[in-house]
Regions:
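ABC transporter nucleotide-binding domain
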Residues: 1-36
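C-terminal coupling/interaction segments
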Residues: 30-68
């Protein structure tokens, strides 16, 4: 579970981010929330984006309700 994270990005950031490790995406009022199981990759390569540690609830919600 510690490898999972929710990325919170603007539409502009979403277009530029590497989507290879994104499991699900979901439109939000701020832009796009993205679930990944490669948290460290995004922390190291995209320091400008918000990376929240994925709680079990967040991971389940994203897996059942996200797009992909």
């Amino acid at each position: 579970l510690e490898k999972y994270a929710v990325l919170k990005v603007s539409e502009e950031q979403y277009q530029a981010v590497d989507k290879r490790y994104l499991l699900k995406e979901k439109k939000e009022f701020f832009g796009v929330a993205c679930l990944t199981n490669e948290k460290q990759y995004y922390i190291e390569n995209y320091p400008e984006i918000v990376v929240e540690s994925g709680s079990l609830d967040q991971v389940i919600l994203m897996l059942t309700g996200g797009e992909r």
